[in-house]
Amino acid sequence: MKMLTRLQVLMLALFSKGFLVSLGDHNFMRREIKIEGDLVLGGLFPINEKGTGTEECGRINEDRGIQRLEAMLFAIDEINKDNYLLPGVKLGVHILDTCSRDTYALEQSLEFVRASLTKVDEAEYMCPDGSYAIQENIPLLIAGVIGGSYSSVSIQVANLLRLFQIPQISYASTSAKLSDKSRYDYFARTVPPDFYQAKAMAEILRYFNWTYVSTVASEGDYGETGIEAFEQEARLRNICIATAEKVGRSNIRKSYDSVIRELLQKPNARVVVLFMRSDDSRELIAAASRVNASFTWVASDGWGAQESIVKGSEHVAYGAITLELASHPVRQFDRYFQSLNPYNNHRNPWFRDFWEQKFQCSLQNKRNHRQICDKHLAIDSSNYEQESKIMFVVNAVYAMAHALHKMQRTLCPNTTKLCDAMKILDGKKLYKDYLLKINFTAPFNPNKGADSIVKFDTYGDGMGRYNVFNFQHIGGKYSYLKVGHWAETLYLDVDSIHWSRNSVPTSQCSDPCAPNEMKNMQPGDVCCWICIPCEPYEYLVDEFTCMDCGPGQWPTADLSGCYNLPEDYIRWEDAWAIGPVTIACLGFMCTCIVITVFIKHNNTPLVKASGRELCYILLFGVSLSYCMTFFFIAKPSPVICALRRLGLGTSFAICYSALLTKTNCIARIFDGVKNGAQRPKFISPSSQVFICLGLILVQIVMVSVWLILETPGTRRYTLPEKRETVILKCNVKDSSMLISLTYDVVLVILCTVYAFKTRKCPENFNEAKFIGFTMYTTCIIWLAFLPIFYVTSSDYRVQTTTMCISVSLSGFVVLGCLFAPKVHIVLFQPQKNVVTHRLHLNRFSVSGTATTYSQSSASTYVPTVCNGREVLDSTTSSL
């Protein structure tokens, strides 16, 4: 036992300088409250604020000091009057002042362990007669301690009390460090740890999209661990810290001024997060007021809803968002506290100082130029508001009482008094078996729901619930208004919040990007970015990435995705369609008229002399070429695309095969005349038809093979420079379409060559001249068409219209050059549509529909020249 005592004294000496002197100095004076009882609870409260300079203690802390102290006394009185809670057991108290300093609090707390040391050592002091020595000034044996307030105080005290297994319950310490049961294994609290509060503060910032903020913390466990927890929560929500400042323990004005200057260096960080003790918060707000700095403050419960913090600096604090632990006012305490005055409250040695400070008067003769206090002064609703943590102080006292009650019922089942088993408390058993397992309804709570339950989790922590306040100016006065709450999730009544500039402030490193812009993040910083516009055809995958929708798609209005663009093609009602269709219809009508005239006058000399069979084939090809306009204007489909590919080349092949057959026939006839050869072969009508069909068949075979190798279909085509337009086209390249006309080009060239060769035929064969003119004009049309076709490839409307008009013009050239003169004679010069002469050649003659053989003739003739050879013109012109 002696070894144990010395070990304890040694460990205490490590914690407090001058402890042994204090322990043995009976003249050591301190202010304290001592009320004897069967069981005594210690109490630690910041009755005085921190002193400045060499002073340990400063002014009286009216709210957090005096009110909380009286709350403990009030709770002890109520428990001692309770017939169900610890009946027959009187609770006493031993209350000390911490002066808001951890080192001072530790020195004061040594008084709590004196009884433990004295109790251990008293067996060593015996009188000669064998009786124990009577000791003076015996310290009270402490069953448990209520306090402290600041986390730094509780940490220091907890390190001491654990050595003597004295349970401790704090009513205000929220540092996350205190949840570490390996270090603070006799500590509990009726408030939650700060990481809940840090989470709530981060969610408030995220709610208002404040992503770039500054922070200020008080030096010590409360501020440092609290702001560390906040920074972790902020990172999870992509909130950046512009500057992180810390206020030391010196409490010097210039240090607060320096912090304000640093905050002003970050103009984009309009929101400042405070995790500070109340006195530090007050000094910082005062420093901001001195330079008229305007910030939106988001403060922890160190600020809470205290009027004293903003007094004199209300205009700077206006619009602040503050958090306070969710609590309800204890109305019974209001009545108790308002009944106190210096004349009836003799057990509180600090109450007279509190009274003089509150009413700015003196209870004795005039001091400090103050007047004598009026005896009618009283605490009432006009000068008093219950401090926010009174409920937690009361709950802490009741929690200790409930634990002692359960322990007394277990160890002393046969009496309501303390039995020998509880004369010396087992602090470890009290803490682990009873205190951590308490579960009761909070006293004086008007609400009887789940929120009124007092209990501890496995770490000895209270439940995490917070109220959100807004500092406002209403009705000519400043006050705090509750605007929300947090209990795992955040609720805010945004409409009730007042802002310093009448609108929700912004606090961002960079301005928000426009809906069509992405954020280009700066290296190593998730809150600063450059806004880069997305391309018109891109959508936003997220706020950092623009993604190409791909060909044929376009982003939605909100850029959240893409949709398929409507297919664009020439419609029948478009101006681009009306023109070509009108021309094609006109050409088709003209063709029908020619066919009708030819059929009606099918047996006339002129029609016979024109080669009826080839003319009808030629007219069919012309009709088909006009029909191609309708195929090119129609909406592309596999069938339409097949008809386009088949019809375009085939229509030309029909026309030019007929013309080639005719010019070839004429050329062979007159070559035979020139050379004196036998009658040429295959110049009969049936032979010419078969030759023509053979030439057409070549084209049909080529196109058929092409259709087999490249199956007709459609495709959605988008020009790189016109991504917003999707053109529905046939799945064939423009070059392939023109290549398919290669055979037709060969036919055109051959026709042109033969037409040129037969250009000097006699007048009755001057149809060759008209064929030549037709071919020359056709070549000019197509030579003009090809450049236009390729140049306008970017505009399918112009390209299609050009194609249709060129095809129609080719038909008009054939009608105008070859058939118009014939129709004119048939209809308007019928006198020329008769047989008056016969053509006599040396060895050939042409009559009717063909050239016939003749041995000789005596008819007269008019000499003319065909290919340098004289021939006879003895019939009408064959036009």
From Swiss-Prot:
Entry's transmembrane regions: 577-599, 614-634, 646-664, 689-709, 735-756, 770-792, 803-828
Claim: Glycoprotein is one of the keywords in the record: yes
Domain of life where this protein originates: Eukaryota
Spans within the Cytoplasmic topological domain: 600-613, 665-688, 757-769, 829-879
GO cellular component labels: astrocyte projection; axon; dendritic spine; glutamatergic synapse; neuron projection; plasma membrane; postsynaptic density; postsynaptic membrane
Subcellular location: Cell membrane
Gene3D superfamilies: 3.40.50.2300, GPCR, family 3, nine cysteines domain
Swiss-Prot/TrEMBL GO biological process terms: cellular response to stress; gene expression; postsynaptic modulation of chemical synaptic transmission; regulation of sensory perception of pain; sensory perception of pain; synaptic transmission, glutamatergic
Cell inner membrane keyword on record: no
Disulfide bonding pattern of the chain: C57-C99, C240-C527, C361-C373, C412-C419, C509-C528, C513-C531, C534-C546, C549-C562
Residues making up the signal peptide according to the UniProt record: 1-22
Function, as annotated: G-protein coupled receptor for glutamate. Ligand binding causes a conformation change that triggers signaling via guanine nucleotide-binding proteins (G proteins) and modulates the activity of down-stream effectors. Signaling inhibits adenylate cyclase activity.
Name this polypeptide is given: Metabotropic glutamate receptor 3
Organism: Mus musculus (Mouse)
Protein encoded by which gene: Grm3
